[in-house]
Amino acid sequence: MKLYQPAEDSFFLAECAKHYCGNMALEIGTGSGIILDTLSQNFNSVVGTDIDYVSLQYYKSNLPKNGALVCCDAASALAIKFDFIVSNPPYLSDHDKKNKDRTINGGPTGIEATLHFIHSAVLVLQKRGKILTIISSLSDRSKLDKLIKEMNLKKRIVKVRKLFFETLYIIEISFDIA
């Protein structure tokens, strides 16, 4: 697997993530580690997961002192709860099945990787915790809205950035509690 090189979306998500703080933060799909680096400045402890062992080895030498890395699918190997979870999942659609690059291929409609990450993340999210993620106007966002409703979650659009071929949305997801 190749390492995802930070691009516009990674920097956009990191820019928004720096406004959150707390005790425990998790980044799902750590890749190059730029978002985990941002989280390490405002959280007591940070954990990064990635399904690709090579990516974790690449980042290991730059790991902050308050950080840990776990090789697993999303949050599947974790049992502790987090105040804040962030992920820049692959979100481009592969409707023509030609794109085999898992670092950018989000599934047939572009949202499947995001749905998988959310299913995993809510299991390790504190009751009043927040999830921050990024989605594209090119993805099937209606599937995300359906999942959020089914799981009794709520979403808020934090920030929007229009690019020449798509619009990126930073989405905050939390439990819908009174």
PLM feature segments, named:
Residues 171-178:
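C-terminal lobe and adjacent flexible extensions of AdoMet/dcAdoMet transferase-like proteins
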Residues 15, 113-170:
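Conserved Class I SAM-dependent methyltransferase catalytic core
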Residues 42, 101-104, 149-150:
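Glycine-rich, phosphate-binding/catalytic loops in enzymes
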Residues 8-87, 93-94:
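Conserved SAM/SAH cofactor-binding pocket of Class I
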Residues 29, 49, 107, 133-134:
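Active-site-adjacent beta-strand anchor residues
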Residues 89-116:
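Mobile active-site "lid"/loop adjacent to the S-adenosyl-L-methionine
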Residues 60-61, 97-100, 144-146:
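Short amphipathic alpha-helical segments
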